[in-house]
């Protein structure tokens, strides 16, 4: 593995772990320019304020939200990560009142890089997987 790939992998691991710890200043510091693209919802959070608002919204709804790394691969300009996202619906989310139910969803994130800094995290997942678990029995 090249030195650049090693550094990028370390940055992605720091990014993901800081999200688990809700240390969002550290998460933001892994970006050259903070940008999240949530493909299933069409949401784009561009810039530090927008990304921090995303963290606030998602962790209000799922205060125990965490990721568990499944696999990690490198490309020329990105690190591709497969992970399980888990959480408990304890706060409101886009008009949905908390259900108290847990979810687990396999996800894929493409971390695009410029040098050794993330410039975009693009996330893919199946929304129905989460909704079915949160709305089970309703």
Question: Where would I find each of the regions flagged by the language model?
Answer:
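C-terminal and inter-domain tail/linker signature
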Residues: 1-138
């Amino acid at each position: 593995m090249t030195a650049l790939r090693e550094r990028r992998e370390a940055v992605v691991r720091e990014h993901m772990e800081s999200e688990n710890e809700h240390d969002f200043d550290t998460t933001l510091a892994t970006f050259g320019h903070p940008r999240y693209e949530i493909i299933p919802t069409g949401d784009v959070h561009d810039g530090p304020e927008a990304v921090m608002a995303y963290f606030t919204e998602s962790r209000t709804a799922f205060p125990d939200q965490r990721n568990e790394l499944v696999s990690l691969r490198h490309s020329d300009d990105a690190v591709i990560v497969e992970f399980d996202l888990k959480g408990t619906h304890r706060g409101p989310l886009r008009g949905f009142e908390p259900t108290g139910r847990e979810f687990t969803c396999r996800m894929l994130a493409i971390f695009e890089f410029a040098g050794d800094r993330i410039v975009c995290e693009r996330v893919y997942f199946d929304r129905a997987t989460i909704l079915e678990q949160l709305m089970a029995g309703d």
